[in-house]
Amino acid sequence: RHSNTGTEEDQTHSERTRLELQEMVSVNESFHLAGLIHLHRRVFCLPSSSPVIQENVKLVLKALSGVRRGGTAESSLLFPMFSAGCEATDPADREAILERLKLVEGLGMTYVRNARNLMEKSWETGKSWEGLVKGEFLG
């Protein structure tokens, strides 16, 4: 009797490798898009409501969809999630980012909670997160 275990293990390993590579591409894309958000906001002084900013927020969300929820890659996504979240004006986009941040926060990373609190305070006040950090809000 012949076993296919080796072949099945190879296929499983190959599939895992493919998923990990796909996640790496998604993580990389989310960082590029977060960089564009910062470029347009800080250098070109576009408001959060700018269509360019909001399109990049949506593209960050699309890139995040390529990263498994609860996977190891997810813990590296605070910068793009926070960047997109602070600039998001669409309630559905905000909710999607908030949900994802809470999932990462559940992994026990307290700095994620602080970032989430700052992002929500930015939404509540309509102030930039930088203005809040320089002002009275410190987490």
Where are these regions (language model features)?
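Intrinsically disordered, low-complexity regulatory regions with latent secondary structure
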Residues: N4-T7, E29, L101-G139
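Amphipathic alpha-helical elements of HEAT/ARM-like alpha-solenoid repeat scaffolds that form extended
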Residues: S75-F82, R113-N117
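Cytosolic regulatory protein-protein interaction regions
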Residues: R1-A73, A84-E99, G106
